[in-house]
Amino acid sequence: MSNVDYIVSTEESDILIENDSKRITDDIVDQLIVYRKQLKLTQQDIADATGIKRANIARLELKKNEASLDSLVRYAKSMKLELAIELVKR
C-alpha cells in the first residue's frame, strides 16, 4: 500500500489509515510467528510466558482480530525480543 496522507480528514482517508494500521500489525504478527517457529516454541509456550490464553495466541496469529499493542509487546518479550515503534518524518 502506498503512503497515506494523514492530514486529509475524509471518510475515505480514515479507511486507508485503518487499512495501513492493519497491514503494519499483520506484518508484526508474521514476524513474531517466524521467530516463534525458529525458536521451536509452541503457542502454548508463548501463552505460558505471557499469561495470554493459548486460544487468544491462536486468534492473534490467525489475525482474527487486530492485536493490541500490549499483546504484541508481551508476545515479543516472551521470546526476548523488543518491539520498537518509530516515528519517521515524511
Model region roles, listed by residue range:
Residues 1-30:
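N-terminal flexible/basic segments that precede or flank functional cores
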Residues 2, 30-47, 74:
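Short basic helix-loop element that most often maps to the first helix and adjoining turn
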Residues 28, 39, 65-68:
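Flexible coil/turn residues that form the inter-helical turn or adjacent wing/linker of helix-turn-helix
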Residues 50-66:
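Recognition helix of helix-turn-helix/homeodomain-like DNA-binding domains
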Residues 70-85:
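DNA major-groove recognition helix of helix-turn-helix/homeodomain DNA-binding modules
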Residues 86-90:
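Short, charged recognition helix plus adjacent turn
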